[in-house]
């Protein structure tokens, strides 16, 4: 199934959707900033009933604002080691997050996803994007710059199609 169809299926459900997009990453580690860049792109779109959070490397610090927003859906976006071509994006279910270590960060996203699902009764998924480099450096690689534009458009179209 194509990414757009997977996201549209993920966002199905509640009529009054309240969506959180949680961008995770480090702005000083090249492609690790992909989640933050996607949040920046989406903020310029002015989407209603959506909370966009650039969580840097500590997404657990934003559970308070997420809880107050009362989300129906939480989409975490992060650079994710999946052994794929750089820039490849894949929607990863909470069940798959629990079974493997995907993130480039120390906090297991499985714990954060489980906490959000259990305490806020929201659907949770990880949109992982394969990095090329997570070395110290401020710029995304060309592959990830292209992925930011492509994936951001897919997220935007999937949300407004709800």
Specify the residue positions occupied by each region the protein language model found.
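N-terminal catalytic or cofactor-binding beta/alpha core of small enzyme domains
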Residues: 1-131, 138-160
């Amino acid at each position: 199934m194509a990414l757009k169809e997977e996201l549209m299926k993920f966002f199905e459900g509640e009529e009054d959707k309240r969506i959180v997009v949680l961008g995770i990453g480090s702005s000083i580690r090249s492609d690790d900033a992909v989640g933050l860049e996607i949040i920046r792109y989406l903020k310029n779109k002015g989407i209603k009933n959506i909370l966009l959070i650039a969580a840097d490397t500590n997404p657990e610090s934003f559970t308070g604002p997420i809880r107050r927003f009362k989300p129906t859906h939480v989409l975490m976006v992060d650079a994710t080691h999946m052994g794929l071509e750089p820039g490849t994006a894949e929607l990863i279910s909470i069940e798959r997050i629990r079974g493997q270590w995907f993130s480039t960060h120390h906090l297991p996203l499985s714990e954060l996803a489980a906490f959000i699902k259990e305490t806020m009764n929201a659907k949770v998924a990880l949109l992982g994007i394969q990095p090329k480099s997570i070395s110290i450096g401020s710029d995304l690689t060309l592959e990830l710059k292209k992925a930011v534009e492509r994936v951001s458009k897919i997220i935007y179209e999937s949300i407004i199609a709800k």
